Amino acid sequence: MTRRGRAVRSITVVVAAFALLLAACSGSETYSGSSDLPAPEDTTGSPENPGTIPQGNFLTTPGAAQRAIDAIVRELGPRRVRYVNMYDSYVIFETQDPAKPENIDRYTYRDGRVGDFEPVNVSGQLQEDIEADLFSITEVNWGAIAGLSETFLAQTELEGGTVVLASVERNPPYQPDVRIDMAMNGTRRNASLQAAGDGTLQNIRVY
């Protein structure tokens, strides 16, 4: 074979190899591209899988109060509590230590986690009185908080009104049932709301 013939054959082989390489790269890019697509955002927000729903305002964002309590229960279990004070972005509560029922501890839930506990001094209180104050954190209708806030704001129409607190507790013998007490601060006046533990509205007062 002449030198020219060998050169033409070499060029033909190189071109064919290059074409095969392009085809292979094209195929790999197709598969790689499909696997690199971001997974659909999970916004289910179930108790087992909170998903990616933003925290929101615990007092006014629908579902935010319940998600906060669900997160607390996931960390500590369905504790019995003496009170729960819920603010716009954090929750403070006192709970009985199930391993040592005579001990009451104070916790703060903030930024998606429960912080370390602080021991509560119960000197002078009988164990039976402590037990009478306790209720299960899961027996309250936390899903009603945002709706109560909406009603609270609508019925009071306070100038600059802002719901600042939802406090849940019982106070036997004067208040034997679990109750939700909410507070609103306004520019010129304040207001309060009372509801049953199941979320049933009982009273709104402007003062």
Regions found by a protein language model. Name each.
Residues 1-15:
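Bacterial N-terminal signal peptides that target proteins for export
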Residues 20-24:
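C-terminal motif of bacterial Sec signal peptides marking the signal peptidase cleavage site
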Residues 26-29:
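Bacterial signal peptide processing site
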Residues 84-105, 167-186:
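Short glycine/threonine-rich beta-strand-turn micro-motifs
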Residues 115-161:
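Long, charged/polar, surface-exposed segments that mediate recognition or autoinhibition
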Residues 159-207:
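Extracellularly exposed regions in secreted/surface proteins, prominently low-complexity, repeat-rich
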